[in-house]
Amino acid sequence: MYRYLAKALLTSRAGPAALGSAANHSAALLGRGPGQPAAASQPGLALAARRHYSELVADREDDPNFFKMVEGFFDRGASIVEDKLVKDLRTQESEEQKRNRVRGILRIIKPCNHVLSLSFPIRRDDGSWEVIEGYRAQHSQHRTPCKGGIRYSTDVSVDEVKALASLMTYKCAVVDVPFGGAKAGVKINPKNYTENELEKITRRFTMELAKKGFIGPGVDVPAPDMNTGEREMSWIADTYASTIGHYDINAHACVTGKPISQGGIHGRISATGRGVFHGIENFINEASYMSILGMTPGFRDKTFVVQGFGNVGLHSMRYLHRFGAKCIAVGESDGSIWNPDGIDPKELEDFRLQHGSLLGFPKAKPYEGSILEIDCDILIPAATEKQLTKSNAPRVKAKIIAEGANGPTTPEADKIFLERNILVIPDLYLNAGGVTVSYFEWLKNLNHVSYGRLTFKYERDSNYHLLMSVQESLERKFGKHGGTIPIVPTAEFQDSISGASEKDIVHSALAYTMERSARQIMHTAMKYNLGLDLRTAAYVNAIEKVFKVYSEAGVTFT
């Protein structure tokens, strides 16, 4: 076991900095004034050093316990924010009583509240019987319903679903989505089952969750995750609505990520990848951060590598490519490909759909080494947890690590990246696009109307009336003999003049959510002199928000 010392949290080595105001801002990010050298210690170290939340951090080896990993990151954030939480309490208590209250609530937040472990039989198409194992973890009910995906994988375990559920709690808090965290897993390899068998498994798993009170529009709302998608979510919604929810008008809000015909929402499939893009965008366009990394702001001419070509990896690659970045390598479980001149995401997607693999793609070469160690500007781990470890972290050459996956970086690797001035954009912020748009879908299901349906024509007519009013006013003032002065909208305005579609509203709301949350993280990082430690800043924000709910609701019956 090891302890993160406060000094490591509150200081950071300075990298190359640009001249002018950007350099001064960078110095502030690194916890010192303009023109001052990096200090050996920072104000507040004496207080932070005696805090004890970081005692239970993950093991030192390369394969730490996943749930302990998340708890360790939580402890880092808690050790930073404890004094502020005590100071902000508005109760008639002594300093010691306030501190005890704060520590008590933090202990309430940290553990996983409920874990359901179940098994059930299915009859396979060949007549044989098989027992299927599954889990659903609910980390926190400070907000309900709980929210989190369902994954199908042979690697599913109790530890994994607990860790992912806890990440969901903090993720929702970071982006101000009013859900508690949850996660489910079914221990199968879906490639080994027919569609009929997968439908049996999905529907039976739904019934088992329903019998135990682990699914429902106001209780617990699953979503797609690894190896699940619209098809499985549709089966879940239909099963719930046809059985336990048959009297519930909101039954289809029991799950998100559904097809449009089943109450889904436009923009949900690409939401996580689009959120990854917006998350990177908010930091790569910030000159103060880029000066620390020795990079110029913007995506243009930046190179990136994607590990994992699933839903998240594909859509992240699409959006970065669209805005001028160049993908030079893509890795999957069966191999990796590389082309220093760039890989087109549409061509690669079409090839994989046709051949079932990335290998053999004619416009790239097979890559035998570790894709995580390729020299690039941005590395996007979008596969599974614990990919960046103490062993390979020193060899990572990317300047920005954008965590599209959940938990891809171990605590030891995270520490190494901080020491090397590598900017890690953390998972609990960066891949929150999926749950954000799931929230929009859930609201759509409860409201029983699609976004824009009630205002679409009104907005269109209002826009045209506005343009006609301007045109007529100009003609009366400046027109000769009643001549026309046509008002010609710009291309951008012309695209939106007819009114916002559901997809437009979803994309705009997602971009705003990611921008607002990024600003909150930047502000917290500067406030606590965290340097490039955005992960701790994000956890601090999440802890403050969850703490506020518990504190103001009262904890007598918690």
From Swiss-Prot:
Which residues does substrate bind?
K84
Positions of post-translational ADP-ribosylcysteine modification: C172
Subunit organization: Homohexamer.
Q: What is its EC number?
A: 1.4.1.3
Q: What is this protein called?
A: Glutamate dehydrogenase 2, mitochondrial
Catalysed reaction equations from the record: L-glutamate + NAD(+) + H2O = 2-oxoglutarate + NH4(+) + NADH + H(+); L-glutamate + NADP(+) + H2O = 2-oxoglutarate + NH4(+) + NADPH + H(+)
What does UniProt give as GO cellular component? mitochondrial matrix; mitochondrion
List the active site: K183
Organism, scientific name = Pan troglodytes
| Gene3D superfamilies tied to this protein | 1.10.287.140, Leucine Dehydrogenase, chain A, domain 1, NAD(P)-binding Rossmann-like Domain
Q: What is its main location?
A: mitochondrion
What's a GO biological-process term for it?
glutamate catabolic process
Summary of the function given for this chain in its UniProt record: Important for recycling the chief excitatory neurotransmitter, glutamate, during neurotransmission.
- Protein family (similarity comment): Belongs to the Glu/Leu/Phe/Val dehydrogenases family.
CDD domains on file: NAD_bind_1_Glu_DH
- SMART domains from the UniProt entry: ELFV_dehydrog
Entry's InterPro entries?
Aminoacid_DH-like_N_sf, Glu/Leu/Phe/Val/Trp_DH, Glu/Leu/Phe/Val/Trp_DH_C, Glu/Leu/Phe/Val/Trp_DH_dimer, Glu/Leu/Phe/Val_DH_AS, NAD(P)-bd_dom_sf, NAD_bind_Glu_DH
Which Gene Ontology molecular function entries are recorded, alphabetically?
glutamate dehydrogenase (NAD+) activity; glutamate dehydrogenase (NADP+) activity
